[in-house]
Amino acid sequence: LIEAYEKGKESRIRNCYGVKKADDNLQQEIDATVKYFQAHNPQSIEISQCDSIYKDGNYTYMYITYNLVLDNNQSYPCISTYMVQKKDNNKYYVLSTSEITDDMSKQAATKYALFMKTDAYKQYATDYDKFIKKNPGYEEKIASKLK
């Protein structure tokens, strides 16, 4: 999914969500995320870790840590989380924001707070802080591209 977003490959993105055509909400989500990746203009992506934060029945809350390798060869640390659901075909698909219930959201927030105490999250936070200190104004530059 991360690589599909970076390349702007909408058919591959929709496949990760298990849909052939995105509804308006999902399409907005896809468009915003593709635009976010385009704003960074990465040369490549390096996936660091991908694992579950928690599992509940057919639902799993996943995290992915990765670096966007920029044109100056610096690595911009990122973390993304996704709620996935195991469907009847035994494949997991990402849930769109509109498919996530309030209860799922609350549980995810609680579990994410615990996840923030793990080594994986601490490493991401350390790497991110180092990048921002070396590149003051980077976030503002990206934010201005997203307006």
Q: Which role fits each region the language model picked out?
A:
Residues V94-K147:
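Low-complexity, intrinsically disordered terminal/linker segments enriched in charged
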Residues D71-S75, D103-K106:
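Extracytoplasmic/secreted cell-surface and envelope-processing proteins
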Residues I47-I53, I79-K86:
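Hydrophobic/aromatic beta-strand elements that line small-molecule binding cavities or substrate pockets
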Residues N58-T60, C78-S80, N90:
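Envelope-exposed proteins and targeting segments
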Residues Y76-T81, T97-E99:
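"Short basic amphipathic alpha-helical interaction patches in structured regions
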Residues Y66-L70, V84, D88:
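Beta-strand elements of well-folded, non-transmembrane domains
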Residues L1-R12, Y124-K134:
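Short, aromatic-enriched amphipathic alpha-helices that serve as compact interaction elements
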Residues S11-Y61, D71-Q74:
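Short solvent-exposed beta->alpha transition segments
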